[in-house]
Amino acid sequence: MSDQPPAENADVRQRRAPESPVTERLRAPARDDARPTSDESDMEGILQDEDSDAGSKNKEEKLERLTQAIPQDKGSLGVFADSMLEALPPRWRNWVVRGLFSIIMISTFTFIVTRGATWLMFLVFLIQFKCFQEIISIGLAVYRLYDFPWFRALSWYFLLTSNYFFFGESLIDYWGIVLKKDNFLHFLVAYHRLVSFALYCIGFVSFVLSLRKGYYMRQFSLFAWTHLTLLLIVSQSFFIIQNIFQGLIWFLAPVAMIICCDIMSYMFGFFWGKTPLIKLSPKKTWEGFIGGAFSTVVFGILLSLALYNRPFFVCPVQHYQTDSSNCTIPLAFQLQDYPVPRPFSFVYKILRKEPIIQLCPFVFHSIALSLFASILGPFGGFFASGFKRAFKIKDFGDVIPGHGGLMDRFDCQLLMGTFVMVYIHSFIRVPDASKLLKQIMTLEPQDQLNIFNLLQSELSKTGLI
């Protein structure tokens, strides 16, 4: 086989298919005046951070600046108290600080519970605002938008709008009962969804008008950050307040179970913890997890036995506010007869007693709530730990010495509030006759008569009248 002449080979190498305009632009040398935008610089910085050692240093510097922008808990109690704890090892110093502020928080919470539903709702809103502020502050630091004052204001505007959408109708009904006024702010209830949507549209248009060239990526990222935070924070606080309306015990018991699980898991892990539980939280141990779960179930049973016969805790809020002296105890809190399990029935036979035990159903409900609080509740904390690790921060804030921010204390409550609401709707809640009557009375007179005639006809068929 004969080789081709060199000249022909050179000609073949020089012949190429015509390039598209896009390819030509990509191959064209960069111009001196072609400067990347702010968003492009961010993307280039991210790629450099992932692919080079120099980028790794830049990443550490950025994370250090982020940590400086977000207050971190140092476990300090002030100069005088710190000097008293100075001789203790850091581990025990942290134990004392955490224990002291745990006692303060539990005492404050107990006082607020005794003041009733209104105080508890204000507490939920206060915690909601602070948790929202902590998460939004992290977003503003990450996307470096502190020099956009209107963006921070927009985030808070969306929070207020979301609260009005979620809480408008229920809180107006509640305050109508408290103030003993019929049709309280009825015009807001009638057009609640329209007003909510109009308020959201104002915020949406304001966001679009605030967009600046070179900051689009950051602004849209924080817009999504804000809405995800609203979904997590506002919706959960809405569920928690709905639980309060069902009776204070549906708020108090789950919250107390989470607190018990946190404390006992910490205690068991502090003294006996050796086996790591999850990489996201290296300090969490299997010993603490199991000890906390067992303690929470026992605590839940004891708490249910202590509160089941107290109308202040078990009556739905609207019924208790209307007539606290004649509140009908819900079925879940009325004593019922249950047969003693066979392995233990022989004890009753020896004592010549009928093998029946009286318990209220809420004792069994408390076991289900305790198991969720101790087994799945901690995953809210693991989720928060993963979030903090993603941004290389230790705490969401420093408002509570020894604990961090409020979000650090209430991360486990997020899942719990939703579970209790789902549990109530699945196993406990029954239609509220007074609420149905109130809705009927808002109808036109002819519609009210139609409902009366239809109801009378159905009751006659069933033989009730």
From Swiss-Prot:
Region annotated Disordered, chain positions: 1-60
Q: Where is the composition biased (Acidic residues)?
A: 39-53
In short, the EC number is 2.7.7.41
Q: What are the BP-aspect GO terms?
A: CDP-diacylglycerol biosynthetic process
**Keywords, ordered alphabetically:** Lipid biosynthesis, Lipid metabolism, Membrane, Nucleotidyltransferase, Phospholipid biosynthesis, Phospholipid metabolism, Transferase, Transmembrane, Transmembrane helix
Q: Where in the cell is it found?
A: Membrane
Which is one Pfam family of this protein? CTP_transf_1
Task: Give the main EC class.
Answer: transferase
Coiled-coil residue spans: none
Its GO CC terms are: endoplasmic reticulum membrane
Q: What do mutants without this gene show?
A: Reduced levels of phosphatidylinositol. No effect on two-cell stage nuclear morphology. Significant rescue of the nuclear morphology defects resulting from inhibition of cnep-1 or partial inhibition of lpin-1 but does not rescue the nuclear envelope disassembly defects observed following depletion of npp-12.
Family label: Belongs to the CDS family.
Its protein name is: Phosphatidate cytidylyltransferase
